[in-house]
Amino acid sequence: MKRIAVIGGGASGLIAACFAAERGSVVVFEKQKKIGRKILVSGNGRCNLSNRVIDAARYHGKNPKFVNNVFARFGPDDTLAFFLSIGIPVVELERGRLYPASLQSSSVVKVFEYELARRGVDVRLHRKIESIKRGNDGFRLTTAGKETHDFDAVILAAGSCAYAPAGASSIGYELAASTGHTVREPFPAILPINIPNKALYRLEGIKWDVGAALEANGRTVARSAGELLFTKYGISGPAALDISRAANENVLARRSPVITIDLFPERSRDELRATLESLWSDANKPIAFSLAGILKERMPEVLCELAGIDPETRIAHAGAAERDRLIATMKDLRLQPGEPRPFAEAVIAAGGVPVDEIDPATMESRIAKGLYITGELLDIDGDTGGFNLQFAWSTGAIAGTAV
């Protein structure tokens, strides 16, 4: 019987093991005390399994169109059918996001535990693989405890270095490199954004619905909309997370990107001006105080400061230039992102093994025959909304079927 190792008990590794069990004797090596640690925290504990609308435009990397070949082999419909077959019906919620009907990540992990046992998969916890050696007859794996195990095929599903609280590390990249693969330098994606602006820090804790964009080299490279959370170091919330990958990529490339925030996306500039002019009818009011009815506490003073206006300036003394600057700040607040925040805070990591080194029909390495690489180890990362888990399910299922 074919001996198959799966390195990593995350999303792609678990589904790979389920399919591979039909083709041989499978052992899953997981360095943590429990499988599915990152699944447990996905979707804020609800497990955003996939998305109703999957296309290459929601993926990034050197060659994002790689996903088209992957999803042609095992796509969202195949994924939903698989989950239904193991007792996890799926429901669709906001923006096409798909979740287990239980709305609990823990139920997904429990079902996988049951399925692996039912299919005869040997799950070995607290087993960190430190080396892969290729030989004439397959692969020899060595654990951190110096145990050695021989296999005919290996599915490398160790995940990225993002989100250390769930046990993430760089070992997957190191193992891939040791077999001859190149690794594009990872960087954190989908996480809060540092903004080196002390005035902005005074808005810590405030949430506000905005339109946001990222500009680099004179063009808009990313857009988002939704809730923005001001923090003690910058910005977070869905509107920030959605542009964080582009922000970090351009910061690291030293392209001096700029984040633009529209605090009133539902109003045109002229409509906002008309609203403000009505609020400025009392010439004796301080200009910051005049905004108290349309902005949350602390926002008027900070926005005035960012616009270069003394918050105590009376309306009567605020000329056209000052008013124009304030309106511009409210409709086009321009912020310079700082260095990326740490991998420990990131949902995913961009970068990884170049996909031109992988056969999308099987996920087998083009460099090391018998080695399969899946999920976030590859140089493909998706937007928030179930796109990354879908890529993990698809690549894992393909590898498990092909091994």
How would you label these PLM feature ranges?
Residues 1-12:
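Beta1/beta-strand and adjacent pyrophosphate-binding region of the FAD-binding site
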Residues 5-7, 29, 129, 149-165, ...:
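Short hydrophobic core segments
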Residues 33-35, 40-41, 49-56, 89, ...:
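An anion/pyrophosphate-binding glycine-rich loop and adjacent beta-alpha core
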Residues 46-92:
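Glycine-rich active-site loop/strand segments that organize a redox cofactor
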Residues 125, 301-381:
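A glycine-rich dinucleotide-binding beta-alpha-beta segment and adjacent secondary-structure elements
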Residues 153-199:
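Glycine-rich loop(s) and the adjacent beta-strand/alpha-helix scaffold that form part
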